[in-house]
Amino acid sequence: MIKLFDPFVGKKEEKILIQTLRGHLWASGAGTNAVYDFEQKFKKYVNSKECVAVNSGTAALNLALSVIDLKNKEVIVPSLTFISTVNAIKLNQGIPVFCEVEPDTGCISVENIKKKISKKTCAVLPVHFGGLSCDLKQISEICKNHKLSLIEDAAHAAGASFNGKKIGRHGDFVCFSFHPVKNLAMPTGGLISINNSDYKKLKKELYAKRWCGITDRKGISYDVKELGNNYYMNEFSAVIGLKQLEKLDGMNKKRKKIAKIYDQEINLEAKIPFENDCSYHLYWILVKNRSRFIKKMMREKIEVGVHYKPVHQMSLYKNNQVKLPVTETIGERIVSIPIHPNLTNSNIEKIIKSVNEFAE
């Protein structure tokens, strides 16, 4: 079976895992040792003001939104995303306002953002879909003009760039996800990159909230001033993350090489565009008869996936009664095909041949 996702790991990850296991310091709510090192190195990598490591991309979104007053306020967000993006708004008592995406990229539509802004809007939450960056220049201008917070969902975008700057350098908060299926793989992990002018204060607040609200820690003494969660990253994830970060650009270069071949040789117009700045977490195509296509691909032992069923069509959010024709069409037809660095030349050839034969 050619896997849809497959982490690119080697002896360096194996060696550091054994060292960490034998070191007996596996986790610390205070975020010391490898967790702190990972924060510092990722901060340097994206050139942000600060970084706070957490235990998942979902935790990153929940935590970032918790330091913004969202109660009964609106957050503009695409529906073409993983459920966590929107749930984080709802969990923080905000109101998700679903926005249309661009048909050729799957990224949030700038023109539709403008139409969705109301007196209740307090933030915009774009998703760098598949690793292709949204138009952060225009979105940042909109947020600045309307005094809105910009929180980016960069779960797919580790290593991606926009206008020569790494994703992680632009928004007030940029939320990353690190998981075995992601470009930077960990058992589980996440991170918030902070660029807001109050970054020092926000980092301190996020540090407390990721460890059950614990603050003012001095020796055995500490205080709790507000609610928090058990969101801190463990040492195993951090040490793997450090090794993965060293080779992230190289792994993404392999993804781009595969993407360029797909772009040239897959005979479909409806597919993710080729962009040098894209991290290609996903390579998506649109097919007319998805269920039949998936069955045929699986018969050829090629694993494929669907990213995603639009969130506004989920039972939890159906009361919004919003119509998003572009999102809904993509949601009915989208299929992700393998694009990870472990693919061999023969794997790539087989995938292209099968897609061209089975897609309509």
Residue ranges with predicted function:
Residues L21, A64, I351, V355:
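Hydrophobic "lid"/C-terminal helical patch
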